[in-house]
């Protein structure tokens, strides 16, 4: 049974009803509508922690979706799942691909920065200070880009940039 027919709670039911209304109202071709159904089911499965099912739906949506902006969000969600599973290199690939399609996606930029910062922390713990600093610098570059796009977000990142001397005057408003 498709996930959209297994609405177990009010939020899922509401989301499904709204999504179905949007699908009927938007002037989209059959392929785009089918891609959206897979994307919607992927988001629902992801919210339930059913990552394998979510990935299956997202991959199917990718085969159908042609719009670059919509594809960027599918790729972003795939990246989130891989990051959640500790597959940071895979997550980075999907986030980068999402940014290629949609450069104005601060959440993907932030997530890339978080991964590089995490890797920097691990390198520091392993006594690899030069590697840690290089990873921190990468994190800083991505956080600066995210902050430029969403200056009121990522306050902790802004503070980290200031504390570590990696901030620039033009980043903060």
Curated annotation (Swiss-Prot):
NCBIfam families, sorted: PRK02603.1
Membrane topology annotation: Peripheral membrane protein
PROSITE patterns recorded: TPR, TPR_REGION
Any single biological process term in GO: photosynthesis
Cellular localisation: Cellular thylakoid membrane
Statement: the UniProt record of this protein carries the keyword Membrane: yes
InterPro entries assigned: PSI_Ycf3_assembly, TPR-like_helical_dom_sf, TPR_rpt, Ycf3/AcsC/BcsC/TPR_MFPF
Gene Ontology cellular component terms for the protein in this record: plasma membrane-derived thylakoid membrane
Keywords: Membrane, Photosynthesis, Repeat, Thylakoid, TPR repeat
Family label: Belongs to the Ycf3 family.
Renumbered ranges of TPR repeats: 35-68, 72-105, 120-153
Pfam families linked to this entry: TPR_1
Organism lineage string: Bacteria, Bacillati, Cyanobacteriota, Cyanophyceae, Oscillatoriophycideae
Protein's name according to its UniProt entry: Photosystem I assembly protein Ycf3
Role noted for this protein: Essential for the assembly of the photosystem I (PSI) complex. May act as a chaperone-like factor to guide the assembly of the PSI subunits.
């Amino acid at each position: 049974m498709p996930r959209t027919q297994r609405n177990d709670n009010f939020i899922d039911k509401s989301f499904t009803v709204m999504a179905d209304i949007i699908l009927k109202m938007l002037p989209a071709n059959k392929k785009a509508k089918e891609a959206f159904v897979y994307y919607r089911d992927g988001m629902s499965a992801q919210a339930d922690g059913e990552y394998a099912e979510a990935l299956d739906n997202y991959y199917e949506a990718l085969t159908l979706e042609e719009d670059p902006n919509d594809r960027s969000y599918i790729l972003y969600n795939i990246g989130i799942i891989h990051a959640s599973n500790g597959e940071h290199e895979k997550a980075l690939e999907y986030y980068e691909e999402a940014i290629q399609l949609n450069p104005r996606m601060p959440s993907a930029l932030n997530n890339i920065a978080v991964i590089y910062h995490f890797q920097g922390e691990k390198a520091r713990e392993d006594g690899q200070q030069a590697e840690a600093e290089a990873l921190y610098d990468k994190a800083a570059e991505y956080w600066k880009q995210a902050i430029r796009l969403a200056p009121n977000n990522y306050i902790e990142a802004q503070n980290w940039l200031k504390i570590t001397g990696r901030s620039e005057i033009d980043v903060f408003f």
